[in-house]
From Swiss-Prot:
Keyword hit for 4Fe-4S: no
Self-association and partners: A component of the endosomal sorting required for transport complex III (ESCRT-III).
Pfam families, A to Z: Snf7 (PF03357)
Protein name, entry field: Vacuolar-sorting protein snf7
An annotated GO cellular component: cytosol
Length: 228
């Protein structure tokens, strides 16, 4: 139907402009096909007249000359036809190139319009502004995460209570060792001692025993001298 309406002037002007190169190329190709057929026909005539002239060159010179005349006419017509074919081919190529250029330009314009719609009112300044806001949001998120993970949730620990618990554990250890050696100390007489104080106490007791032995020896010597 669109083709019929086109013959009678129907259809939009834009559609006509779009179809104009195609119609021109179609008409040129039709004419080119006809000229190529004519080229083959003329070439056949030339070959045929050349054969007639060769056949009658010795027996019938008149017929040979007529054949050569027809051959010359066909060659002249063929030369003109070949020129027309070359011209049509050039025109077809020119129109096709122009049409391709137009379609390429139209595609580029459509791409530009699409990019314009995608970007809208977006500008490099707005992009920088949004990126800065995004960085601020990320920094705030990191600060919040740090505050949450570093917060000491619950009651604060009393260091004094920890020291009391440590002394109780040390006293229990001392009591356990005394129980193993058979000794006993009343609960109210127990003294909280440092874990490292036991060795020092034993050293002091040993030194005291040595001093007492020396004193006893000196006392015995004095008694012997008085007895004399």
């Amino acid at each position: 139907m669109s083709g019929i309406w086109g013959w009678f002037g129907g259809g939009s002007a834009a559609q006509k402009r779009k179809d104009s190169p195609k119609n021109a190329i179609l008409g040129l190709r039709t004419q080119l096909d006809m000229l190529q057929k004519r080229e083959r026909h003329l070439q056949n005539q030339i070959d045929e007249q050349d054969a007639i002239a060769r056949k009658n060159v010795s027996t019938n010179k008149t017929a040979a000359k007529q054949a050569l005349r027809r051959k010359k006419v066909a060659e002249s017509t063929l030369e003109t036809t070949l020129g027309q074919i070359t011209t049509l081919e050039q025109q077809i190529n020119a129109i096709e190139s122009a049409n391709i250029n137009r379609e390429t330009l139209a595609a580029m314009q459509a791409a530009r319009e699409a990019m314009g719609k995608i970007h809208g009112k977006l500008t490099p300044e707005k992009v920088d502004e949004e990126m800065a806001k995004l960085q601020e949001a990320n920094d705030l998120s990191n600060e919040i995460a740090t505050a949450i993970t570093s917060a000491n949730i619950g009651q604060p620990i009393d260091e004094g209570e920890l020291e009391d618990e440590l002394e109780k554990l040390q006293q229990e250890e001392v009591d356990s060792k005394l129980h193993e050696t058979g000794g006993s100390i009343p609960v109210h007489d127990k003294i909280s001692l440092p874990a490292a104080g036991t060795g020092a106490l034993k050293g002091k007791e040993k030194a005291k025993a040595v001093v007492e032995d020396d004193e006893e020896e000196e006392l015995r010597k004095l008694q012997a001298e008085m007895a004399m």
